[in-house]
């Protein structure tokens, strides 16, 4: 069953809140490529940004990953997370290994991964 995109964004926001981040979401409408802003009390400004895609039938490719890198650069954000219910193309994964952006999504066993660490 496919997860509705807004519900998925809310689940992702709650996950980051439970793992110690202060979260801020955008109002409905154009989000500029960012679904959740992550903040740390000890760090001024936005510490990381999150883009969510509830795509089970599509793989996230290089284009949306590059776009998120562009937002990170334009907004001087040091870290990013791209979260999907589906998978990533090999080129998209390779691109994220070269920077501060992590691909997050389920592995073939249904476990969620953040970089090389699994979420249970």
How would you label these PLM feature ranges?
Residues 1-120:
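Mixed-charge (Asp/Glu-Lys/Arg
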């Amino acid at each position: 069953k496919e997860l509705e995109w807004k519900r998925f964004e809310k689940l992702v926001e709650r996950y980051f809140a439970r793992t110690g981040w202060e979260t801020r979401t955008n109002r409905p409408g154009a989000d500029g490529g960012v679904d959740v802003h992550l903040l740390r009390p000890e760090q001024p400004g936005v510490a990381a940004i999150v883009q969510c895609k509830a795509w089970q039938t599509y793989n996230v490719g290089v284009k949306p990953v590059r776009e998120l890198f562009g937002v990170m650069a334009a907004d001087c954000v040091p870290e990013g997370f791209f979260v999907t219910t589906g998978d990533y193309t090999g080129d998209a994964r390779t691109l994220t290994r070269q920077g501060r952006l992590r691909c997050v999504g389920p592995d073939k066993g249904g476990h969620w991964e953040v970089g090389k660490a699994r979420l249970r």
